[in-house]
Every structure is written in C-alpha cells, then in structure tokens.
UniProtKB/Swiss-Prot annotation:
Top-rank lineage group of the source organism: Eukaryota
Identification of the protein by name: Lipolysis-activating peptide 1-alpha chain
Record's comment describing the protein's domains: Has the structural arrangement of an alpha-helix connected to antiparallel beta-sheets by disulfide bonds (CS-alpha/beta).
Family stated for the protein in its record: Belongs to the long (3 C-C) scorpion toxin superfamily.
SS bonds (residue pairs): 39-62, 48-67, 52-69
Domain LCN-type CS-alpha/beta per the UniProt entry, residue ranges: 25-88
Signal peptide range: 1-21
Main location: secreted
Keywords of this entry: Disulfide bond, G-protein coupled receptor impairing toxin, Ion channel impairing toxin, Neurotoxin, Potassium channel impairing toxin, Secreted, Signal, Toxin, Voltage-gated potassium channel impairing toxin, Voltage-gated sodium channel impairing toxin
C-alpha cells in the first residue's frame, strides 16, 4: 500500500515537471548570404555569442552545428534587417519622419 502510494505521488510529481518546460524561443540567425552560421564547438562559445549580439540579442550557443540565438525574433533573423532595427547610426539609417 505504501509503495503504491509512493509510486503514484512520484509519477504525479514527474508529470507536473514535464508540463512546466523551460523551452526558450529563439531562431537561427542568417548571414549576409542567407546561410545559417556554422559552428564547430557545440554548446556555449564566444563565436555564437558575438553572432547573436550582432543580431540584437544577448545570448546564443552552438546547437546542431549552427549558432542558435535565444529570444531572436523573426524580424531580426536576417543580417541586414537586424542591423537596420538595432543600428544607432543616423547617417546610415536616418530617423523616420
């Protein structure tokens, strides 16, 4: 009886943990040529972090041999779109009137 109760409680707690997932939205950024950035060192690395910062987000890592940026929105996936959205240079991108 005690074992059955223990197993039931354990299964319920396990299922509750599955429903609360920590999936973070993100995207693979695209280079000037429309390709995903390749990376050789899986996991956290400085190269992917720099790529993600150039696309306007603060964190990224190598996943599936491509740089993955957490919280990268669809509008910033393309290299030039990201720079246009985040560039502070008024001469390059004059403010809209």
């Amino acid at each position: 009886m005690n074992i059955t109760l223990f197993c039931s409680v354990f299964i319920l707690i396990s299922l509750a943990g599955l429903s609360v997932s920590d999936d973070v939205p993100g995207n693979y950024p695209m280079s000037l040529y429309g390709n995903k950035y390749s990376c050789g060192v899986l996991g956290e690395n400085e190269y992917c972090r720099k790529i993600c910062k150039s696309h306007g987000v603060s964190y990224g890592y190598c996943f599936n041999s491509r740089c993955w940026c957490e919280y990268l929105e669809d509008k910033d996936v393309d290299f030039w779109a990201a720079h246009k959205n985040h560039c502070k240079n008024d001469k390059l991108y004059p403010p809209k009137k």
